[in-house]
């Protein structure tokens, strides 16, 4: 239905885009509402005080919003009323807040259209590389590469301090000028009024109150900077491979030749300097990235300075150096994609025999290791209201109105997803504590619903009611290792298994990346 309604605004090849009229279409806001309901199992809709119905599901308010947007300067007046009512505590401020949220979510749906059109030509090739889309496919690559590297840059990707920079970057993806003007108007009014409340933190407030729109703007910015970054990285391969010359006098010494390359990128019209590093790997997920190198400490330090200057001179904002940490792999662990990863050094002795002589050779082997971050996971459970900050299980009041089967199914689904996602951990025993918290939280939620105690509930329903919370990993149904597999996975709490059917990070681990 939506595809038929979009045909009048878009060309098949995406060359002509008339996105601005979509802002006044009611079904756009319906799509935004449906996305909000299905985005996470932790979604908890707000209710309008005194009215008793879900604010995001009200088609009446959406129709009123569209009618007001047809009027001149209505968006400015709406946001002005919202911010003025915040100071005086007026009840109608919620309606203005609703207008701001719906405009933000509706425009985010529209902004996703140009990105989705770029994926249409390659839709036939996606099934062939389905396994490569899995998040877990990154870890075998890290196991193979990072164990031989010396240093890693742990990077928190900075974001522009001004929202106008994000709009300018979005122009590369959206050619509809009225839509960009509308976005500028919305962001300009939001920025001006929030500076009265929280100066210098406008973009932080915007990212929390308009998560979906901010994610679109942020992803376009990351895509742009990675395009330039990868372009420069590819250019470095055309440099000469000789990086040093040997001279023989009394002793051997080496004169290191630093290779620099002059690159002029048409989009920025600036000269960018790039250091040659043949052994470098870059991995990113959301706002965090790691840059690993086999080079020396001096080379990795130059990489840090280069990245700071790269963001400063090409995106016009200052990246704080403390957001980029230089760490040696030998004594450092980093959090990435819901795992705590490190390179373990295992000493071993090898017995060699030459003729009749025996001697021992001490060797060191490096192994890439991943474990479950228990304390951060408990913090995520605390944010989701499953336990206290200390890890004491509590009931989930908002789920107490559901049926018993739905409550057990929701808690059980969380446990199964956690076991499935953290199957690559070398120490799965630490997940038992997380399962215990969820099991007791489920029991307390059921006891709250039936107005009973946990002990009486388990005596009445039986202790086997919550058995699925301690299901072993080899019993979890998976398209890679089905339950009817012919070979048992003995010792699966020690074996690491990477599944190729996981295309998004677990919700609980997702809280950690954006916190």
From Swiss-Prot:
Coiled coil start-end: none
Pfam families: Intron_maturas2, MatK_N
InterPro entries in the record: Domain_X, Maturase_MatK, Maturase_MatK_N
Chief location bin: plastid
Keyword line: Chloroplast, mRNA processing, Plastid, RNA-binding, tRNA processing
Domain of life: Eukaryota
A biological process from GO: tRNA processing
Presence of the UniProt keyword Chloroplast in the record: yes
GO MF annotation terms: RNA binding
Known role: Usually encoded in the trnK tRNA gene intron. Probably assists in splicing its own and other chloroplast group II introns.
Protein name: Maturase K
Species name: Trillium pusillum (Dwarf wakerobin)
